[in-house]
Every structure is written in structure tokens, then in C-alpha cells.
Amino acid sequence: AGGIGVSHNGNLTNSISLRNKLVEEGAIFYTTSDTETIVQLIAKSKRSKTIDKIIDAIFQIQGGYALVMMTQKSLIGVRDPYGIRPLMIGKLGNSYVLASETCALDIIGAKFIREVENGEIVLIENDELTSIKPFSPKKVRPCVFEYIYFSRPDSLLDNKTAYEHRKNLGKELAKENDLKADIVVPVPDSGNAAALGFAQHLKMNFEHGLIRNHYVGRTFIEPSQKIRSLGVKLKLNANQSTIKDKKIILIDDSLVRGTTSYKIVKMLYDAGAKEVHVRIACPEIKYPDFYGVDTPTKKELLAANKSNDEICEYIGAKSLKFLSIDGLYRAIGF
């Protein structure tokens, strides 16, 4: 594309067909990334201005995406027509900054201005921002997993931190709960805020019954089952003095494949827990998300293939409940 860099958060749903077409037309690909497909489309455009080449490209792609591009003279941000993936605008002195989350702006001392709107392109040149809206208006449909899991707790989503949204998820989960226990234990760090909201609403004791090694990354997004299983052992350890002989309500943000939940429940029982009741601060995940979440097939999703009782038995818990869809809507305000 001649002097352009592209960074991409999301997933293109028509990347394979676009790639095949480009290869037939003579394009040479150096990676398997769908981001390169976007670069190839920009390079192929016959338009003279870079911004017009970008518009040509994004009219051909489908999916959930937030793009940040740089040329020698400009910074460009693009958000998909439904706003599935977030993109934020900040200001540092007289200059503009683009980032997927507001916490990135905080770190460098930039002031959060606003989100890039769904279907909007922002062109920044000579410290001036121009808004371009090439798509017809669409209803915003952000990915709910940004609220549940992806975004860092201190990042803003709809003028509330992800932490506040997750506490609300825990509060709504507590409203649907009919069980009393000795302690509420989060799966760190993803379940921390929801567990706190849950415990506060029911006036129950909140305890860190699991201690996390922060030098190990997220197990949910690891590519293979073997690595995910090993990751749980390396990442978490039971705090025996806190959980021994206790009836526990274990709170996590979500249950996708069940790998992590099974290992954690076993870990708690091995450490002396009397009962482990699992409560999940989002509804059952039964269908794949092709817009950027690592759930490629229905076969991998536990809730798509087992009943609630079967999942409970599979993970080894005394009982299992998920937040209702209505509870999710109330918590996030959709």
C-alpha cells in the first residue's frame, strides 16, 4: 500500500473469500492474518487518495473490527458499522491518540475525548480531526464480552468502567440466587468485580480463596486444550487457610469450554472445601462468535452440548447457575 501501517482488533467474517479472490488476481500474501487482507485491498484500490483507498477497502470487508492506520502524514481510525469492537479518541497536548481502551489513554496521560462512532472513520492530520461517515446508519451492537471479560476493569464503556458493569453483573446474579454460603470466592482476576457485587448485595463474606500468579496470561484465549489445562495449574493456587471446611460460592465471569472451571473446582475440593457452588455472571454461551472471540465451533462450547445438570456434573460442582439474559441486560443497560 506504499507507506501505510495497519493494526486491527477484531475478526473479518469474509476474509477467506476475499483472500482467495485477491490471490486469483495476483496478490502475494506473506502471513495468514486477516489484517493483511485489509492491506492488500487498500493497495489494490485504484483511487488516488489514501483515505479513498481505505474507504474502498472497508466497503469490501465484513465483521467486527477496529482499525488504526498510520501513514507519513496521517493517523486514521475506523470502526465497523455496528460498533462491535471499541475504539477511543484521546488528546495529549495538541495531538490526538487512538486506542482500543481508555486505560491506554490514562497510562500516557492523554485525556479521553469520545468513542469513534460505529461506522465512522476519523482522519487526523496536522493535529486536526476530520470525521467521515461513509456507511448508512446502523444500530450499535457492541460485543457483550467487552463488558464481561475483554476490557480492562478501569476502562470506560458507555461512560462507566468495566469494573462497575461487572459489579452490576454480580449484583444481578445475586438477585437470582437462593443459596447461602460461608464465603464468596472469585476466580481471579476475571471474576473479582462480579464476586464483589454478588457478596455486597447479599451481605456475604468476600474472600480471596484463589491466589493468582500474574506472570501467566489468559487461559481462555490460549490456542490448544493442553496449553489451557497447564495454564490453569500455573496461574492459580488455592488459599487453604481461607477455604478449608467452608461452603463456597465460586464466581466467574463466564464458562466457555469448562476446562478452567473443572480444574478450579477440583483444586478447591483438594484444598479442603466442604461444598463448591458455581455461579456464572453471564448467560450460557451456546453459539460461536465469529467477530473476534476465540470460540470457533459449537462443538467446543460446553453449554451447547450439555444441560445445566450435565455441566455441573462435568465440572464437579455441588450446584451451578448462570445469570439470565434479562439479568445481563439489566446489569449493562442494553
Regions found by a protein language model. Give the residues of each.
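Secondary-structure transition/capping motifs at alpha-helix termini
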Residues: 27, 47-48, 176-182, 200-207, ...
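A polyampholytic, Gly/Pro-enriched intrinsically disordered region
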Residues: 49-56, 226-235, 297-304
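A conserved beta-strand->alpha-helix junction
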Residues: 31, 36, 206-217, 314-332
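Extended, hydrophobic alpha-helical segments in both membrane/secreted and soluble proteins
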Residues: 184, 191-198, 202, 206, ...
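Flexible loop/turn segments at secondary-structure boundaries
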Residues: 14, 84-85, 105-106, 130-131, ...
